Each structure stands twice: as structure tokens, then as C-alpha cells.
UniProtKB/Swiss-Prot annotation:
Subcellular location: Cell outer membrane; Bacterial flagellum basal body
The species this protein was found in: Thermotoga maritima (strain ATCC 43589 / DSM 3109 / JCM 10099 / NBRC 100826 / MSB8)
Protein name: Flagellar L-ring protein
Quaternary organization: The basal body constitutes a major portion of the flagellar organelle and consists of four rings (L,P,S, and M) mounted on a central rod.
Family recorded in the similarity comment: Belongs to the FlgH family.
Alphabetized Pfam families for the sequence: FlgH (PF02107)
A GO biological process held by the record: bacterial-type flagellum-dependent cell motility
Transmembrane feature ranges: none
Any one GO MF annotation of this record: cytoskeletal motor activity
PANTHER family assigned to the protein according to its UniProt record, in alphabetical order: FLAGELLAR L-RING PROTEIN
Keyword terms: Bacterial flagellum, Cell outer membrane, Membrane, Signal
Length: 199
């Protein structure tokens, strides 16, 4: 008799409460019980981790670029003005002790909380974060904007700044960051080389 009453009680309880938390994942009160919460809609907050890559390139490569640029510059000046620059600028000064290898190091510079302000047609999250930091006695406001794929959001609701598409970093209202900050154009190398001649 006792077994029958327990069975009837279980049947009665399941008929009154027919839902299960395993089948009701779509309901807000049961959502993310077993999953990790990540930013997914407008208004959600995530953390952007800004890393600095210190790329110590080999001096041998740098000297080869300088030598090539000097040769090009010397040929242009020689053809245009008839002056041989090799008499004035030493080209073969790449001593063996200056030829070192290179390595890449990465370190966390800052973490900025960002808010999802929009979702583009492809499902990417448009984020914007602001942070005010004190440098000496001055305050500087940093604004980070960009798009994040939901798959790039890591555990802890963080995303690496290198994963931001169409990214912009503003400091005190001035744009200071382009899409590929570590990539130096050929024009930048020429300007850096010419500046190095006069310093």
C-alpha cells in the first residue's frame, strides 16, 4: 500500500509540474545554468584585454634594409645630380657584433570594460569601451571601438584586442590606433631610415 501511494504521489507531482529545467533552457530563469555566460545582446558587458607586442626585430634585417635604401637613394642622386653618395655615407658598416636574433614578447597592458552597442547583420557584436586613467597629474580618456565575433569571446567574458575587427582606439578625442598597428609600411621604413640619418 505504501508503494502505491508513493507512485501515485510521483505521478500527481509530475502532472502538476510538467516542465523540466533540462527542457526549459529557453526560459530566462533556467538559461545558462550549465553554460558560461558571454556577451550576446545589446547592453551586455565584456572585457577587452589590450596586449602590447614588443617585437624586437633582428638588427641584421634592419641593416640590410638600410643598405638597400642607401643604394637606391645613392643611385637616384648619382643619376640626377652626378654626386656619388657612397663617398659621404658609409654603406658597409654592418659589424658582426650588431647582428642579433629577434623575439616576440607579449604582455597585458590594460583591461577595458566594453558595452555591446549594436549587432551587425552578420551577428558580430559592435562594442565600445571607455576608461579614464591618470598619467602623472593628467587624466586621459581611452575609448576602444570595434566588432567582435561571438566565437572569439573567451572564458571569463573576455576578448583579446587583436580579435577586434574595424578597431579604433581614441585617446583624448584623437585617433591613435589603426587596424594593423604592428605592420609597418614600406613608406614608414623609408621615413624612419631617413630620420635615422639625421639623428
Amino acid at each position: 500500500m505504501r508503494r502505491i501511494s508513493i507512485v501515485l504521489l510521483i505521478v500527481f507531482a509530475t502532472s502538476i509540474f510538467p516542465f523540466s529545467i533540462w527542457n526549459s533552457a529557453g526560459e530566462s530563469e533556467y538559461k545558462n545554468l550549465l553554460s558560461i555566460k558571454k556577451a550576446s545582446k545589446v547592453g551586455d558587458i565584456l572585457t577587452i584585454v589590450i596586449r602590447e607586442s614588443n617585437n624586437v626585430s633582428s638588427e641584421r634585417e634592419s641593416l640590410e634594409i638600410q643598405k638597400t635604401l642607401l643604394n637606391i637613394l645613392g643611385n637616384v642622386v648619382n643619376a640626377a645630380a652626378g654626386v656619388n653618395l657612397n663617398n659621404f655615407i658609409p654603406i658597409n658598416n654592418n659589424s658582426p657584433e650588431r647582428q642579433r636574433g629577434g623575439k616576440v614578447q607579449s604582455s597585458v597592458v590594460a583591461k577595458i570594460s566594453a558595452v555591446v552597442v549594436d549587432i551587425d547583420p552578420y551577428g558580430n557584436l559592435v562594442v565600445e569601451g571607455r576608461k579614464t586613467i591618470k598619467v602623472d597629474k593628467d587624466y586621459q580618456e581611452i575609448i576602444v571601438k570595434g566588432k567582435v565575433r561571438p566565437d572569439d569571446i573567451e572564458i571569463g567574458n573576455e576578448v583579446d584586442s587583436s580579435k577586434l575587427a574595424d578597431s579604433e582606439i581614441w585617446v583624448n578625442g584623437k585617433l591613435v590606433f589603426s587596424e594593423e598597428p604592428g605592420k609597418e609600411s614600406f613608406f614608414d621604413k623609408i621615413l624612419a631610415f631617413l630620420a635615422g640619418l639625421f639623428t
